Amino acid sequence: MTKSHEAVTHWYPASVAAKRPTPWWYWGRAVYVSRRDYWKITKYFLAVGIPLGAIGVMFRLPLAFWASVALAEIGLLLLAYSLFGLYRMYGHPGARYVRRLVELGSLKGKVTVADLHIGTYRHAFLLSDVLPEATIQTVDCWNVEGESPEEAVQDVRDLEAPPTSNPRIVAYKADHFTLPLPDASCDAVCFGFGTHEIPTGGAREKLFSEANRILRPGGKVLLFEHGWDAHNYVIFGPVIHHVTKRQDWDKFLRERFDDVKYARSTQAVDLFAGTRR
């Protein structure tokens, strides 16, 4: 069993099961769950900038004063770029990389897609938009012992309820990474943001084995994730260091699937598609 989670009161509004959240809501939630990282980075800037400014004023050192001003400007510029980057990933432009991912996997028509995630149903909605004839079986796969290494995961889970607004989207819950779906019942499985939070050394391997089990012969595996690179570092800050590297995802997928393809979206999202053996 997972460790019990104490109820937390959030000042960001939670979703309603019977109503699809807007792209603005998803962007706002991404900003909200990143608040700890923003504050941590802000403290570093303040710890350097305030003393510099004080030294410049007290000792009449223009260089120190203007260095503090420049530091503040850099901080504001990085914040603005981060907020814009999050919007491109989680706001309205996010549909573009999901569409490109579906094209990379050559999916179309009346397919059945398993959306495997850790508590956000955003991916299911986007898949239903890009594949208007598809049935989306969205499965909450989060079942990790103890606390998440990233507090944002629990925030994400607290704020979004399983959807009931779209008849083509059916929500399920995995049991210790065992999927409640029959063998060879899906044309594709999709893993999205947050998959890197599922630990290696057992849990991740089991979940991808389950994905293979529910895929029909020739079925597709799709994956979109944050990369470990300079672009994502500017958007997310040092927290990006704990995500899985592109090379590691590529190796992991090639060990389990055939014809693995890779593409990079303009929103700094890594895209992978492969075929069941």
Segments from the language model and where they lie:
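A short glycine-rich, Lys/Arg-flanked "PGG" loop and its adjoining helix->strand segment in the class I
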Residues: 204-217
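A short acidic, Gly/Pro-enriched loop at the edge of an enzyme's catalytic core
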Residues: 177-189
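Class I SAM-dependent methyltransferase Rossmann-like catalytic core
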Residues: 28-47, 57-106
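Conserved class I S-adenosyl-L-methionine
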Residues: 109-120
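Conserved beta-strand signature within the Rossmann-like core of class I S-adenosyl-L-methionine
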Residues: 218-225
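Short alpha-helix
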Residues: 240-257, 262
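Class I SAM-dependent methyltransferase SAM/SAH-binding core
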Residues: 120-178
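Core SAM-dependent methyltransferase catalytic element
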Residues: 258-277
